Amino acid sequence: MVNKIFIAIIISILVSFVISPMAKNIYSDPDLSKTSRKFDGFTIDFRGIDTPNSTYWALCNWQMDLTEFKKTYPDATGGGAYGGLQTGINVKKAIMSFWEIHYKENGKDKILRSNRIYPKGSESTFGGEGEGTNYISNFNWPTNVWHRFVLHSWKDSSTGKTFVGEWIQNLSTKQWTLFAYFNTNLENSYITGGLSQFQENYNANYFGVERSFQIKNMCL
């Protein structure tokens, strides 16, 4: 890790919304003012306590640094990313997603997308709040058990591109799982941005129920 800065945070939030058809999001924004804001890794411990259907816990929202890319394409925008854990309809999942990077080349609009390297398979894309590439898959993480969520970026030796991976550890069994990693198709990039978290009810059919979670032990 670039910065061995431990942020002792534990948040326990209990939410019940019985009027609004969509539960309001709950955000956590770490104070990064005393860091370099240039990271090759991020970890956070998470425990879901009340985990009803259609809940998403964003464990890190970050930005891929575009400094090197903007030397050639100064108008480039985008490059956000996020990862976390989710409940679907009676199923649990994990997520890793990268938004597109938009730029112009010889006056023409261009798009740079991240490519999934692991696990192998056809590319999955998403729309709605912007467009990009993602991987969402069943991941049976147990309720009321602490999990360690880890992001790591590195320069791939064969391509020279910046790769980013997502690992999840069950802290009860000590078992690690490599969930996914992507080629960002950027060079000399790294993890930056706000590194925020949030809880979201994304399906109006499942409002009005309690949702609670805890987070602690952020490390950059």
Label every PLM stretch briefly.
Residues 1-4:
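Positively charged n-region of N-terminal signal peptides that target proteins for export
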Residues 8-16:
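Bacterial N-terminal signal peptides
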Residues 22-121:
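Secretory/extracellular carbohydrate-interaction modules
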Residues 124-148:
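Short, aromatic/His-centered strand-loop micro-motif at the edge of beta-sheets
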Residues 141-178:
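Carbohydrate-binding surfaces in secreted/extracellular proteins
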Residues 179, 183-209:
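Flexible glycan-contacting loops in extracellular carbohydrate-active proteins
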Residues 207-220:
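Exposed low-complexity, polar/acidic, P/S/T/G-rich flexible segments that act as propeptides
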